[in-house]
């Protein structure tokens, strides 16, 4: 038999030698070699599979096991997908095939995988593409990125390693162009505004450090955007003079400073430092906001939103707002919205103000208003009021830290809960509240029941303790995915925020002052400049004005040599066995052994790996369901 095959092969070889133009028939793709369950909740299943070379996408099919009826057929370009809205306790059957550019060469379906939402336990990742097995990548490379073991356990692709809460699945500019900011101009080629005004998926990186003095509002109107402030050299980037407004879906903003001030023509219209409403899929991470004329950072009416690890301080009280005294922290709310590990310091009020129905276009049926998770935030040195509002809303208040400062009125509560919106007199009912683990330094024994002031606005509306809930209000992803967050005790969260909150890759003196004052219970500056005292300020000049932001301060992002222009500097590519002369490896996934993040995304994480790891240290990572 072996001889016959050999002879046949010889004849074939002679035939081919006579006609070299005959191409061998291409082989069809193989199906994914392995399929596994990477996450499961009561109503969702997340499946992952191994990558197939030359596949342009993957066709997925999910059927019920009991009757074989089809539940979903879809296609994706990645190697993971979540099916939502499933029935708890029902068994489903999943399979996937690799699709080629020529569909005739697409693979057959993989072996079937059966799973039950709420019962099946996710599998350990088989790690088929461990970068440590790649001879070009140094041993132990993946461990150097310090990605949380909890995130590795569920294996989900997040906005970035360390993204948590309602906006954790935001994709931003993933897979898009890299746009370099090369100057500090307000507009024009190489400016931040020009990069933001582009369309399509894009990741904005910075080759410069310093202050961008805006000449008009910076409006983000085109989504699918990642602004990676951590890529700036030295002291980083600060935005001045006008508000930044998020008016698009699918936006990631990280390690930026928004220090508005009272200069220029913005001074009479009640500007916030940064704000956004009525958008979807947004995450604001490790940013610093100050010197607003109205609120420092207001985000409400957004769906699947997260603001995490931010510092908001020193809004301007007796400034140039046309309504007179202001100086507020922010208005916070939305639907599946998370606000965690943030510091609100030195604001007269709105620390925060939880949203109310009349903020929305239809108060009787407000779109994008739902459950809000407010946890592990720290509030220090309010003036007239701390946290209040929430008419008719739904809020978790978990493990937050409150501390009076030199300017603080004695507010003996965690929340001043409103039922009546005073401007219209409409009674929307008190908010529904799940309260647990909150801590007030001056009143350490305060309980959840004691910590709510039911504000009746002189209408004799009685307190409504039935609005205090016994179970957590769930937060879910845009397609019903399970949402996770890290929770510390209130005191530990305060310590973590002061350690790594804000644009802390290189922290400036404004954030240093905010954290020092909050930790010591003091006010570095007692004269606010126009009559305010005790750390509440009226003008930036009262605290020394804007710091200088040098490009020369020690920072791992300082060496900007990037021969192939792919957003990853040569030193990083050389360190991890990539090719500094080939831009194609930016989109590869050789550095993430779990196949979630591109090499470019891993570089963006590399710059802040220690900040992200330090923040979650000592916390408990769990689903918000």
Task: Give residue spans per PLM region.
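Right-handed parallel beta-helix
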Residues: 224, 229, 249-260, 278-291, ...
């Amino acid at each position: 038999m072996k001889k016959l095959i050999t002879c046949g092969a010889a004849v074939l070889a002679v035939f081919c030698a006579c006609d070299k133009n005959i191409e061998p028939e291409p082989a069809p793709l193989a199906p994914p070699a392995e399929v596994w369950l990477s996450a499961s909740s009561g109503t969702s299943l997340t499946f992952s599979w191994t990558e197939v070379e030359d596949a342009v996408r993957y066709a997925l099919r999910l059927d019920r096991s009991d009757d074989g009826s089809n539940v979903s057929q879809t296609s994706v370009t990645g190697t993971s997908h979540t099916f939502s809205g499933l029935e708890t306790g029902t068994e489903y059957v999943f399979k996937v095939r690799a699709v080629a550019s020529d569909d005739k060469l697409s693979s057959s379906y993989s072996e079937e995988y059966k799973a039950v939402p709420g019962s099946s336990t996710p599998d350990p990742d088989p790690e088929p593409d461990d970068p440590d097995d790649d001879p070009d990548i140094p041993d132990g490379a993946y461990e150097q990125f310090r990605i949380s073991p909890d995130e590795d356990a569920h294996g989900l692709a997040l906005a970035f390693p360390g993204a948590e809460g309602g906006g954790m699945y935001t994709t931003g500019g993933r897979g898009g162009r890299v746009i370099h900011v090369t100057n500090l101009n307000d507009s024009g080629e190489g400016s931040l505004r020009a990069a933001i005004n582009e369309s399509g998926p894009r990741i904005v990186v910075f080759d410069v450090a310093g202050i961008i003095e805006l000449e008009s509002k910076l409006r983000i109107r085109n989504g699918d955007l990642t602004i990676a402030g951590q890529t700036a050299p030295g002291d980083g980037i600060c935005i001045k003079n006008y508000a930044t407004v998020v008016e698009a879906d699918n936006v990631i903003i990280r390690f930026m400073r928004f220090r508005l001030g009272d200069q220029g023509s913005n001074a009479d219209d009640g500007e916030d430092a940064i704000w956004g409403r009525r958008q979807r899929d947004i995450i604001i991470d490790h940013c610093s906001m100050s010197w607003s004329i109205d609120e420092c950072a207001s985000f409400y009416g957004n769906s699947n939103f997260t603001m995490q690890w931010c510092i908001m301080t020193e809004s301007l009280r007796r400034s140039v707002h046309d309504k007179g005294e202001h100086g507020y922290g922010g208005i916070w709310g939305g639907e599946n919205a998370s606000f965690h590990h943030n510091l609100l310091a030195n604001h007269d009020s709105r620390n925060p103000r939880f949203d109310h129905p009349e903020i929305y276009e239809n108060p009787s049926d407000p779109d994008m208003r739902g459950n809000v998770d407010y946890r592990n935030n720290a509030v220090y040195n309010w003036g007239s009021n701390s946290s209040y509002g929430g008419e008719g809303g739904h809020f978790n208040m978990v493990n937050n830290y409150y501390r009076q400062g030199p300017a603080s009125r004695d507010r003996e509560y965690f929340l001043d809960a409103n039922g009546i919106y005073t401007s219209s007199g409409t009674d929307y009912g008190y908010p529904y509240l799940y309260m647990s683990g909150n801590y007030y330094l001056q009143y350490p024994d305060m309980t959840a029941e004691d910590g709510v002031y039911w504000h009746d606005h002189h209408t004799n509306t009685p307190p409504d303790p039935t609005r205090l809930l016994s179970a957590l209000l769930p937060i879910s992803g845009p397609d019903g995915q399970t949402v996770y967050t890290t929770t510390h005790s209130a005191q530990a969260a305060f310590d973590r925020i002061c350690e790594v909150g804000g644009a802390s890759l290189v922290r400036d003196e404004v954030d240093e002052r905010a954290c020092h004052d909050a930790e010591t219970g003091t006010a570095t500056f007692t004269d606010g400049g126009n009559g305010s005292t005790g750390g509440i300020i009226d003008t930036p000049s009262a605290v020394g004005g804007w710091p200088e932001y040098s490009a020369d301060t020690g920072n791992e992002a300082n060496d900007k040599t990037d021969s192939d222009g792919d957003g990853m500097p040569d030193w990083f590519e050389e360190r991890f066995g990539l090719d500094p002369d080939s831009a194609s490896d930016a989109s590869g996934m050789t550095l993430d052994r779990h196949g979630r993040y591109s090499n470019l995304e891993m570089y963006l994480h590399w710059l802040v790996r220690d900040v992200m790891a330090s923040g979650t240290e000592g916390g408990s990572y769990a689903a918000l369901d």
